[in-house]
Amino acid sequence: MKRTGPTDPNLRRLIRFLKKKSNEEGVKIWKDLAWRLERPRRQRAEVNVSKINRYAKDGDMIVVPGSVLGAGKLEKKVIVAAWKFSETARKKITEAGGEAITIEELIERNPKGSGVIIME
C-alpha cells in the first residue's frame, strides 16, 4: 500500500513550509522536524508538560513535532512550539511565565534554529 502522508491540509502546508525553509536557510533541523511530522498520527510525539519540566532549563526553546498535553506541572519559563496544544497545557505554560507558540512563529523568531531543542 502506498504511503500517503498526513491528510490534514494545514499539516501538509506546514510540512511544505518547513522543507522550504530548510532549503532556503540551509538548516537541517527544519527538515528533520518535517520528517517527524510526516509520520503516522499514532507515531507522532505526545509530550506532557511534566517531561518539559524535567528536561528543559529556564529560557529554552523547545519544539514538539506533535501534541503537548497538560499532565504534570511546569515550573520553568520556556518557549514551547508545537503542532497542537491541549487547553490545560497552554494554560500551564503561560502561568509558568513561558510561551506556547506555533512552529511557524518559532521559525519567524529563529530562522536558523539555533538553540532549539526537539522533544519527543
From Swiss-Prot:
The alphabetized UniProt keywords are: Ribonucleoprotein, Ribosomal protein
A GO BP entry:
translation
Q: Name one GO cellular component term.
A: cytosolic large ribosomal subunit
The family database entries (PROSITE patterns) matched by this protein are listed as: RIBOSOMAL_L18E (PS01106)
For this protein, the record's SUPFAM superfamilies field holds: Ribosomal proteins L15p and L18e
Pfam families, per the entry: Ribosomal_L18
> What stretches pass through the bilayer?
none
Output the superkingdom of the source species: Archaea
Record flagged with keyword Cell membrane: no
The molecular function terms of the Gene Ontology recorded here are: RNA binding; structural constituent of ribosome
For this chain, the family text in UniProt reads: Belongs to the eukaryotic ribosomal protein eL18 family.
The record's section on PANTHER family has: 60S RIBOSOMAL PROTEIN L18, LARGE RIBOSOMAL SUBUNIT PROTEIN EL18
Report the protein name in the record. Large ribosomal subunit protein eL18
Organism from which the protein derives: Pyrococcus horikoshii (strain ATCC 700860 / DSM 12428 / JCM 9974 / NBRC 100139 / OT-3)
